[in-house]
């Protein structure tokens, strides 16, 4: 039996030529960083360094910093990515050269109509969307929206009390996931879902489906390894976002808009109405107003950016408070002083709680919402002696930056005092960036912080959280691309109304 197939010379030539071309494609960009004198892990043909993500992007970034220092290069398939942890260069990338060179995030896609979302849009379209949407997130608008958010904080407390009375440990993600979903649906669309008690609600189901990303999903891998397939996928109407969810939200926004126009509801205070108002503003140029498709794209991004990130952040704060009872007690004391006799929280009271702000900031340092920031270089540029070719993705690894012992003494420890009034002014804004920095930072930062703080106040006014047998200590981080704990955070919740037992 012959081991080598009996093929014609022409077939062999074609086969060998194909393999050579395939190898050239899989390695043509992989010499870039070596040529520039930038260290980094050795890439594999075609794959680059993507298999190094097996233990998680955050772990890969942390390991690279320890091995290579503040600057290193690696490859996702053929795409060169330059990692930067130097605060001076970070400032230039995110702020000084934002408009001229580093305006855009990496286009990762096919994404369908989500190209029109503020987080994905580019250059002039992004500037236009940012200009139109920024007034929606001002302190004044959020203050108007606060009563809507507070009602969901009250529902959170009721749901938590009902769970606490069962006497069983509670999954934080279940409770706070429902709260986050309710806040987003209520403030975005004026819809009351009560997602904890109505998990089969189509709104909840379609929203959760958007968030199911796996780093080694074959479809995503094909986009990373063969980026030239993206326009083909777009022609075939493929998308990294689930089609049924996208169609649901397109139709939903269209229906809601139609109903509001028919009933002349112009005084509602939610994001959909505020976006609709851009279409009707007298001083607004017609070509600048948001289209219906753009409104749908922003609505999906609010869900995508708000639901999972907010609920995970609150869950992690509760974990740290449960494992640091002294911090929890100090925070409860501040809440009780500010809101005696469980008085309803006000916007101004929430904004004035200094220790609450310290606790939230420290938790976001340890567990940043986004573990990476990315910008694409629009042209060749040299920054502080580092040459960055056009098309290179500049990546800022937030996780190791927030835990860098050069900037943070005992970086693995939970210590809210780092963010006290005395210390906060000494923190470089380019080493602490839970919501990014510069003109393209997270537009929903204030909204997210209010949502988080409102939940923390509601819980600690009424309950004390404690670790239990099911609590994973120490906490381990998942290897999935969306930052989350490896296992659900399970805690015991005890009502503060119950009389204390024992001495």
Curated annotation (Swiss-Prot):
Q: Which residues bind heme?
A: 442
Enzyme class, first EC level, given as a word:
oxidoreductase
What Gene Ontology molecular-function terms does this entry list? heme binding; iron ion binding; oxidoreductase activity, acting on paired donors, with incorporation or reduction of molecular oxygen, reduced flavin or flavoprotein as one donor, and incorporation of one atom of oxygen
GO CC, one annotated term: endoplasmic reticulum membrane
Sorted alphabetically, which CDD domains does this protein's record hold? CYP3A
EC number annotated for this UniProt entry: 1.14.14.1
Q: Quote the subcellular location field of this record.
A: Endoplasmic reticulum membrane; Microsome membrane
Report the catalytic activity.
Answer: an organic molecule + reduced [NADPH--hemoprotein reductase] + O2 = an alcohol + oxidized [NADPH--hemoprotein reductase] + H2O + H(+)
Note the InterPro entries from the entry.
Answer: Cyt_P450, Cyt_P450_CS, Cyt_P450_E_CYP3A, Cyt_P450_E_grp-II, Cyt_P450_sf, Cytochrome_P450_3A
Q: Say if the entry is tagged with keyword Transferase.
A: no
UniProt topology in membrane? Peripheral membrane protein
Any Pfam family matching the protein: p450
| Induction comment | P450 can be induced to high levels in liver and other tissues by various foreign compounds, including drugs, pesticides, and carcinogens.
Keywords noted in UniProt:
Endoplasmic reticulum, Heme, Iron, Membrane, Metal-binding, Microsome, Monooxygenase, Oxidoreductase
* PROSITE patterns in alphabetical order: CYTOCHROME_P450 (PS00086)
Q: Which cofactor does it need?
A: heme
Which GO BP terms, alphabetically?
response to bacterium
**Similarity-based family:** Belongs to the cytochrome P450 family.
State its role: Cytochromes P450 are a group of heme-thiolate monooxygenases. In liver microsomes, this enzyme is involved in an NADPH-dependent electron transport pathway. It oxidizes a variety of structurally unrelated compounds, including steroids, fatty acids, and xenobiotics.
- Its recorded name reads Cytochrome P450 3A25
State the organism of origin: Mus musculus (Mouse)
